[in-house]
C-alpha cells in the first residue's frame, strides 16, 4: 500500500509495460486516483471505508488473484485480493484499526461482500508459499481456477495448498454469514 497518486500509478504502469501496451493497442490507463468513502450496508465489522473509484464505477468486476499464503490471514486469494480496492496509504490505516486476525478477516469479508465481483480467476501456475504477501518462495503448482464466487474459489485454493478452509478465518466468517461454502 504505497501512495495512490497519479505519478505513482504512471510509474507502476510504465514499469510493468502497460504504458507501451496501451499505446500499441489503443486503450487508456486510469491514473486519476480518485476514491470515495462508502458505506457497506451489510457489514459486520467495518461499516465505512474508502474505495478507489474504478471499483465503484464499473459494469463488471473481474478479481484476478495469485494463489499464495499470507503471514497475517494465512491465505491470500480472491477475497484478500479485493483489499487492493482500498487506496494506497489507507491500507495500513485499516491494519491499525483491525490489528487482530479475526477483526481484519471480518473486514475483508465486509469489503468482498460489498464489491461483489462478477468473476474471480486465481493464478496458481506459479504460486507462493511462506510469509506472504512479499516474503514467500515461488512454488510451481500449474493450476488456474475460476468461479463466480470468491469464497468458493478460495476454498478450492486453500485445499490445493493443504490448508483446511475452516482454518482460514475469512472463509469461516464468509461461511457463517451464508456467503460461501
Q: What are these language model-derived features?
A:
Residues 1-181:
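N-terminal and secondary-structure boundary signal
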Amino acid at each position: 500500500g504505497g501512495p495512490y497518486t497519479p505519478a505513482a500509478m504512471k510509474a507502476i504502469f510504465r514499469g510493468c509495460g502497460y504504458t507501451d501496451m496501451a499505446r500499441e493497442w489503443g486503450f487508456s490507463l486510469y491514473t486519476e486516483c480518485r476514491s470515495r468513502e462508502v458505506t457497506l450496508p451489510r457489514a459486520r465489522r467495518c461499516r465505512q471505508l474508502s474505495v478507489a473509484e474504478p471499483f465503484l464505477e464499473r459494469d463488471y468486476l473481474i478479481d484476478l488473484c495469485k494463489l499464495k499464503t499470507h503471514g497475517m490471514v494465512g491465505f491470500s486469494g480472491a477475497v484478500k485480493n479485493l483489499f487492493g480496492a482500498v487506496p494506497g496509504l489507507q491500507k495500513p490505516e485499516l491494519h491499525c484499526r483491525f490489528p487482530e486476525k479475526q477483526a481484519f478477516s471480518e473486514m475483508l469479508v465486509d469489503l468482498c461482500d460489498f464489491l461483489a465481483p462478477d468473476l474471480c480467476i486465481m493464478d496458481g501456475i506459479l504460486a507462493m508459499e511462506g510469509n506472504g504477501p512479499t516474503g514467500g518462495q515461488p512454488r510451481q503448482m500449474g493450476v488456474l481456477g475460476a468461479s463466480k464466487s470468491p469464497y468458493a474459489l478460495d476454498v478450492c485454493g486453500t485445499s490445493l495448498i493443504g490448508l483446511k478452509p475452516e482454518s482460514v478465518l475469512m472463509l469461516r466468517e464468509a461461511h457463517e454469514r451464508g456467503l460461501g461454502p
